[in-house]
């Protein structure tokens, strides 16, 4: 699903007016939808955190894996959608504070005694700065034609990204 540039900018402005991040809004709506369709009032999902730390002045020029993972939860309540987004936003701010903690350790702790079973089969991958050079604001020298991610024990990976101001949403399953 691709949003137009105007739709994306309008959405971002509305989100900004509420002092939320797009990641918090989109992930909350995603979890709310999962909870409703699975008839499960509470659930947790695996969140991909981009963790490129400025260890060297040229680190942004390095192509590589700079991710970590964490877990966020959703609990269906009678509260408003705004309250649910606020709760997700608070969780995300906490995740940023502890981003140096290896998320794989959390998954190991959760999997204790559950050999062979998927622990967090739903993933939310959010890249709202896309493949844009912050210096030139131009696309890099490559164009994505097709993409798919395949990860063991992941049933659904919800991708959200911003490509030069166009919000793009996709699912790998």
What do these predicted ranges mean?
Residues 2, 73-75, 159, 172:
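Generic structural detector for well-ordered beta-strands
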Residues 1-8:
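DNA breakage-rejoining catalytic core of tyrosine-based enzymes
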Residues 11, 128, 172:
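Regulatory/sensor and coupling segments of signal-transduction and defense proteins
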Residues 14-27, 37-145:
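His-Asp-centered acyl/peptidyl-transfer active-site segments
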Residues 22, 159-173:
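Histidine-centered acyl-transfer/condensation active-site motif
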Residues 139-164:
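Low-complexity, glycine/alanine/valine/leucine- and proline-rich hydrophobic stretches
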